[in-house]
């Protein structure tokens, strides 16, 4: 999930390599170049390719982002995207453990760092490896796009792994509360469903359904291949053509999510009561998609309200000994999502006191606004955190991955240019527009103390 990983254009330009002219390779269309990144399309099937050479170290990251996440699931298949992500490592007729050339065996033998992740709007697969091994990884990654084995004998044990992850989340107070808040806030839109899925769907989804899901979304024209680091652009495009070029476009239109969440007309509340030690309060408000022009100002608002010990929430709550931590986060997703606030209760604190303190601080911002100094400090925080988050080819690819998922990879370069232009007036305006009590969902995590064992 993107957590303020985007940097300012000015900063990005300072750390990017000098831009070279895009290369011309038969079978590709050059789409555009921006900030040291060249975008191409593979003519045979519509695969999007992003190239960003950087020869500062002999390392390259290859990442494939599929535009499918939990927003593409329905009741009965929730968690399918994530379970399929696990099964993508089980091999194919060409690359498998019996042959000694599975993706795990290859990448571990060369010391690569690799993994895959699933989120609301996307699934990604990646490896950071020595430049000389790029072709070997591209070959395996391309192969599993269309030739994956999907066997029931693999589904059953992998399902138990995913179910264990589900149970770990259930035992985390903030994660458990967050799931309930999303489910209450989104009644129609599929952001209602947790990315890991509902337990019964995790346990019961069939291998046939997973195959159907794979055959629906895992196609070149629903994917982006991003290559960042030490490579030659013409040679890299040659590898993409060699290993992806034989695949056709999807034989059907990729299904699009068209469900829109109806306007919320009143506040909603949820309560989670289960074993635990400390309570939580969460308050979320409907917020726009990542590409909306108000999102940068909401990001600045979140930094002012809930980022660090100098933030308004932290100071207001700790002055009253009410909290151990407080945070605010502006949503950065493909569709309208949530502006989220969380506070962990200090021992002895009451939920209602924490909630009231948060709401009072929000009303203060809506009425009186914020200072120019607060805005400047928030922008500086955003700039600095981005610099730390873009350390290396994998870190950069990860940020671009979230921008692809949000609907536009160029947000990697343009988003923080907009953040730099946010004013105190902008922050006050978005606070009044979006932090609307009638569009809020409030949740309490109330720990239940287990009774003492009797002798």
Language-model segments: which ranges?
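Residues that act as N-cap/strand-start positions at coil-to-secondary-structure junctions
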Residues: 33-36, 266, 426
């Amino acid at each position: 999930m993107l957590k303020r990983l985007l940097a300012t254009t000015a900063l990005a330009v300072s750390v990017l390599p000098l831009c070279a002219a895009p290369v011309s390779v038969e079978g590709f269309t050059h789409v555009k170049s921006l900030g040291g990144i060249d975008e191409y399309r593979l003519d045979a099937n519509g695969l999007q390719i992003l190239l960003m050479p950087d020869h500062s170290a002999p390392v390259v990251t290859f990442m494939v982002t599929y535009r499918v996440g939990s927003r593409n699931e329905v009741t009965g298949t929730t968690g399918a995207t994530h379970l399929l992500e696990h099964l993508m490592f089980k091999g194919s007729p060409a690359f498998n453990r019996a042959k000694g050339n599975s993706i795990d065996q290859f990448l571990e033998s060369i010391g690569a760092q690799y993994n895959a992740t699933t989120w609301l709007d996307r699934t990604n697969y990646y490896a950071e490896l020595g430049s000389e091994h790029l072709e070997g990884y591209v070959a395996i990654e391309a192969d599993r796009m269309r030739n994956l084995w999907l066997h029931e004998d693999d589904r059953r044990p992998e399902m138990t792994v995913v179910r264990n992850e589900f149970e770990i989340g259930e035992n985390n107070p903030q994660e458990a509360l967050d799931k309930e808040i999303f489910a209450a806030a989104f009644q129609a839109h599929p952001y209602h469903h947790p990315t890991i899925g509902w337990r019964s769907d995790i346990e019961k989804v069939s291998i046939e359904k997973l195959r159907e899901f794979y055959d629906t979304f895992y196609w070149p024209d629903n994917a982006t291949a991003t290559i960042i680091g030490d490579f030659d652009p013409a040679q890299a495009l040659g590898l993409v053509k060699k290993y992806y070029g034989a695949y056709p476009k999807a034989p059907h239109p990729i299904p699009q999510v068209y469900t829109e969440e109806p306007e919320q007309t009143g506040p909603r509340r949820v309560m989670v009561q289960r074993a635990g030690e400390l309570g939580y309060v969460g308050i979320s408000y409907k917020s726009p998609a990542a590409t909306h022009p108000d999102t940068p100002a909401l990001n600045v608002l979140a930094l002012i309200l809930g980022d660090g010990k100098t933030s308004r929430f932290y100071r207001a709550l700790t002055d009253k000994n009410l909290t151990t931590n407080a945070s605010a986060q502006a949503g950065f997703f493909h569709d309208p999502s949530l502006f989220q606030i969380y506070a962990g209760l200090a021992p002895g604190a009451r939920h209602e006191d924490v909630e009231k303190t948060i709401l009072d601080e929000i009303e203060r911002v809506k009425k009186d606004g914020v200072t120019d100094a607060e805005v400047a400090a928030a922008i500086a925080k955003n700039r600095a955190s981005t610099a730390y988050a873009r350390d290396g080819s994998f870190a950069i690819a990860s940020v671009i991955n979230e921008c692809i998922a949000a609907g536009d990879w160029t947000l990697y370069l343009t988003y923080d240019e907009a953040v730099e232009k946010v004013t105190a007036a902008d922050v006050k305006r978005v606070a009044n527009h979006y932090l609307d009590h009638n569009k809020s969902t409030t949740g309490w995590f109330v720990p239940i103390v287990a009774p003492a064992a009797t002798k």
